[in-house]
Swiss-Prot record:
It catalyses: reduced [plastocyanin] + hnu + oxidized [2Fe-2S]-[ferredoxin] = oxidized [plastocyanin] + reduced [2Fe-2S]-[ferredoxin]. GO terms for cellular component: photosystem I; plasma membrane-derived thylakoid membrane. This is Photosystem I P700 chlorophyll a apoprotein A2. The PsaA/B heterodimer binds the P700 divinyl chlorophyll special pair and subsequent electron acceptors. PSI consists of a core antenna complex that captures photons, and an electron transfer chain that converts photonic excitation into a charge separation. The cyanobacterial PSI reaction center is composed of one copy each of PsaA,B,C,D,E,F,I,J,K,L,M and X, and forms trimeric complexes. It comes from Prochlorococcus marinus (strain MIT 9303). The gene is psaB. Divinyl chlorophyll a B1 binds at H669. Coiled coil: none annotated. GO terms for biological process: photosynthesis.
Length: 749
């Protein structure tokens, strides 16, 4: 007899309704809730899934390598990266006739193709790849690695090769391994690749499997390293006239501290990047020897956290401190065990860090691009900024979700008595109310300023606008070296201590050249009143998103309205009809509501980045500066003008290469709008509709030839909300992704 899905829950498997299917899917990855699950088995299953996760990533990367080598134009692009458009892949079956086939036969191809806006060409070129053969070799190597990963995942599920629970919970050993091996060695290995392969290739010296053991990356080899003359590796860097990929103007340095960007490629100096990675690698390896493991020396987390409190005999604030300002509690006592025993706490920390890093990458790739010529591929820059910002918001919403699950499932009040976690829970009303106040202040004031400016412009008196200069932000830019504001502070003042120290550094340095360059290549673009207003609009969105998420996590265990909330779990719709006011207050609901605000916020942030850069790239900063001070300017001069090009991807007179984005733009709107159908109508509506459809099905002679085992029932309220927010988010992303790419590509290709 076949086992009914889901095999991990016999209770669900015996459910006679379609609830069996939907709840089975919903809980498939909630390993903690599965039948017969032990803590050790939970860790082992999660450990094994990591191998599968890495394998999926590897297949994705290998697929990119293979398809570009097969269907792209990598070698042609390498020969002229500033003028040849990179091809992502061929389009096998362009629908809608010859017109679309002709429109999509582009970038020198002989058949319909998609243009590549992912930056992969720039990345591979920068790290030293030059031929399709090298791309194929990379794909094959990664596929072999994937096979090993899949084998490793399977192996670690076998009884003899399952790690023990103690192994998973040895935090010191894990931290040493992650710091020294994963981060330390890989950073130094990447420096090795840059020094031995990428930098020689950037200077016209090919390095391949045939000669990488014989080509010296530096004329003096390892002699300066062993003699302590490390400065030799920084001498004779590439000149400002260096033609990337050739020996013209090339130097011999491999580890430099030049600052700024390569004038021709527009990217950070490769020798600066290699220096950056070796420095990080050395620090990480030192850090990887800090924690006590095999030899009984070094720190332990428990000693650090338990010693970090105002009751500890070594606390510097001990004498008289508590008498003056009150007792601070047990601070971090118990925190190590709390984190080490909660996978949700650990995942929350990891997601918060990775989400922040993703947002940092979004900004970094625009302001300080690492890859040769990517700064001049404006559509790719816009696509990558948008991509990484959207990733960031979902990761950070996930961080708070798992923080809330920690409070519901893993938090032990006794183990955390009077420590920082308990203190945060005790002061949650103050935290939440202050955040609420900040949101109202930001929202009302920012909207009022925008609306005032809209009204006075509508009445023909733009001189009556309230325009606030962002003087504090300009001060920060000046401190970093931007001189246009006339603020003589730090690096903007040639006689300040930092400027004199910088001037005293040996060799040439180009940071000041970059920060004071023309706007389209400057990483600190000039800012004014429009920036001030949109900054506060984005701040409103960030604070409101944070308010919803923080409130959801801090109230996850209980609130004045519902003190026993933790007993209902992380996600529940309401506590039945007899207890009013308990709908929409589960911790899951706060994540659900925060996603809408997060999407709003990141749209505003990306609108801002995109419009400002479009204006800079077109040499028309005045348009942004004048139109961004009022809402109609945003609607008319950014959204409407740029949407019009996409909507005309196809029309009664013909079709062009923007048409795929036009279809995506419309389809994204459709998916987005479909979300509201699930968000507004609740479970009863769908149950009645299903029953009507079943009635009609059973009375149709042909349809009734097909039956079903499970009684059809509507999704739960929580599941319907998930369907709604998923449609909203996916539609939002498809709409805006198509908008960004098409509106930029229509101007710059």
């Amino acid at each position: 007899m076949a086992t009914k899905f889901p095999s991990f829950s016999q209770g669900l498997a015996q459910d006679p309704t379609t609830r069996r299917i939907w709840y089975g899917i919903a809980t498939a990855h909630d390993f903690e809730s599965h039948d017969g699950m032990t803590e050790e088995r939970l860790y082992q299953k999660l450990f094994s899934t990591h191998f599968g996760h890495l394998a999926v990533i590897g297949l994705w990367v290998a697929g990119n390598l293979f398809h570009i080598a097969w269907q792209g134009n990598f070698e042609q692009w390498v020969a002229d990266p500033q003028n040849v458009q990179p091809i992502a892949h061929a389009i096998w079956d362009p629908h809608f006739g010859q017109g679309i086939s002709d429109a999509l036969t582009q970038a020198g191809a002989s058949r319909p193709v998609n243009i590549c806006y992912s930056g992969l060409y720039h990345w591979w070129y920068t790290i030293g790849m030059r031929t399709n053969t090298e791309l194929y070799q990379g794909a094959i190597f990664i596929d072999i690695l994937v096979a090993w990963l899949l084998f490793g995942g399977w192996l670690h599920l076998q009884p003899k090769f399952r790690p023990s629970l103690a192994w998973f919970k040895n935090a010191e050993a894990m931290m040493n391994h992650h710091l020294a091996v994963l981060f330390g060695f890989t950073n130094i290995a990447w420096t090795g690749h840059l020094v031995h392969v990428a930098i020689p290739e950037s200077r016209g010296q090919h390095v391949g499997w045939d000669n990488f053991l014989t080509v010296l990356p530096h004329p003096e080899g390892l002699t300066p390293f062993f003699t302590g003359n490390w400065g030799a590796y920084a001498q004779n860097p590439d000149s400002l006239n260096h033609a990337f990929g050739t020996s013209e103007g090339a130097g011999t340095a491999i580890l430099t501290f030049l600052g700024g960007v390569h004038p021709q490629s527009g990217a950070l100096w490769l020798t600066d990047i290699s220096h950056h990675h070796i420095a990080i690698g050395v620090f990480m390896i030192i850090g990887g020897h800090m924690y006590r493991n095999s030899f009984g020396i070094g720190h332990t987390f428990k000693e650090i956290t338990d010693g970090h409190n105002t009751s500890h005999p070594n606390d510097p604030h001990k004498d008289g401190f508590r008498e003056k300002i009150g007792h601070y509690g047990l601070s971090h006592t118990g925190i190590t065990d709390t984190i080490n025993n909660s996978l949700h706490f650990q995942l929350g920390l990891a997601l918060a860090c990775l989400g922040t890093a993703a947002s940092l990458v979004a900004h970094h790739m625009g302001a300080l691009p690492s890859y040769a010529f990517i700064a001049q591929d404006y559509t790719t820059q816009a696509a990558l900024y948008t991509h990484h910002q959207y990733i960031a918001i979902f990761l950070m919403c996930g961080a708070f979700s798992h923080g809330a699950i920690f409070f519901v499932r893993d938090y032990d009040p006794e183990a955390n008595k009077d420590n920082v976690l308990a203190r945060v829970l005790e002061t949650k009303e103050a935290l939440i109310s202050h955040l609420s106040w900040v949101c109202m202040l930001l929202g009302f004031h920012t909207l009022a300023l925008y609306l005032h400016n809209d009204v006075v412009i509508a009445f023909g008196t733009p001189e009556k606008q309230i325009l606030v200069e962002p003087i504090f932000a300009q001060f920060i830019q000046a401190a970093s070296g931007k001189v246009m504001y006339g603020l003589d502070v730090l690096l903007a003042n040639a006689n300040s201590a930092p400027s004199l120290a910088a001037a005293g550094m040996p060799g040439d340095h180009y940071w000041m050249d970059l920060i004071n360059a023309s706007p389209e290549v400057s990483n600190f673009m000039p800012i004014g009143p429009g920036d001030f207003l949109v900054h506060h609009g984005i701040a409103l969105g960030l604070h409101t998103t944070a308010l919803i998420l923080i409130k959801g996590a801090l109230d996850a265990r209980g609130s004045k309205l519902m003190p026993d909330k933790k007993d209902f779990g992380y996600a529940f719709a309401c506590d039945g009809p007899g207890r009013g006011g308990t709908c929409d207050i589960s911790a899951w609901d706060s994540t659900y509501m925060a996603i809408f605000w997060a999407l709003n916020t990141i749209a505003w942030a990306t609108y801002y980045w995109h419009w400002k850069h479009l204006a800079a790239w077109q040499g028309n900063m005045a348009q942004f500066n004048e139109s961004s001070t009022h809402l109609m300017g945003w609607f008319r001069d950014y959204l409407w003008i740029n949407s019009s090009q996409i909507i005309n991807g196809y029309n009664p007179f013909g079709i062009n290469n923007l048409s795929p984005w036009a279809y995506m733009f419309l389809a994204g709107h459709l998916v987005w709008a479909t979300g509201f159908m699930f968000l507004i109508s609740w479970r009863g509506y769908w149950q009645e509709l299903i029953e009507t459809l079943v009635w009609a099905h059973q009375r149709s002679p042909i349809a009734n030839l097909v039956g079903w085992r499970d009684k059809p029932v509507a999704l739960s309220i929580v599941q319907a909300r998930l369907v709604g927010v998923t449609h909203f988010a996916v539609g939002n992303i498809f709409t805006f992704g198509a908008f960004v790419i098409a509106s930029t590509a229509s101007k710059f290709g």
